[in-house]
Amino acid sequence: AVLPENLDDFDENNQLKLVKLKDGMLKNHGYCATTIDGVECALVTCDEGVFLFTPPESPVEQWEIKQLLDVPASDAVICDFDSDGKLELGIIEKFHGDVLSIYRINDQGKYEKCWEYPEKLEMLHAIWAGTLCGKKRFVVGNRRGNRKTIAVSWEAGEYQTEIIEENTGAANILHFMNKEGKDIIVAANREINEVAMFIFE
């Protein structure tokens, strides 16, 4: 729906008109708002894979919907992790799955897996990607088993990982910069009833 400036006239008897963009997306769990080439768009993940939704320039035009990957995914982020000028996909495979992976674009313009975390991470849930301490990083957390919060980055020609903390079980992760210009990560550690804040120097 196109949101008007004033929503006061809308209620249960007079609702905004919603337009279906796409159906047939089972377990459409993941949503990631992002900007690509200056255009705001969204990644949506489901059993059918990873889709990129790009809004039209005019409300009367159609949205562009592109399937980037046909691998069942719970959540995804898109970021140029290795600084090669192409956007990689960081995904949690399957619904709340245990496989953390990164896909890159091959010479045919298709996404193919280039990295996978070497061990299973039960019930992966928290996910974020962006610039952290001057480098592109992929930060994730899982809610069962070892309950790690992990940062993945491209170092010396390969993906390397760093464990931020263990035995916590992050369900969501938020990143921002404070007034002093320091990177902050806030993790909602659901499994231990804790909200943790990390200040990176």
Region roles according to the model:
Residues 1-201:
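Beta-propeller-forming repeat regions
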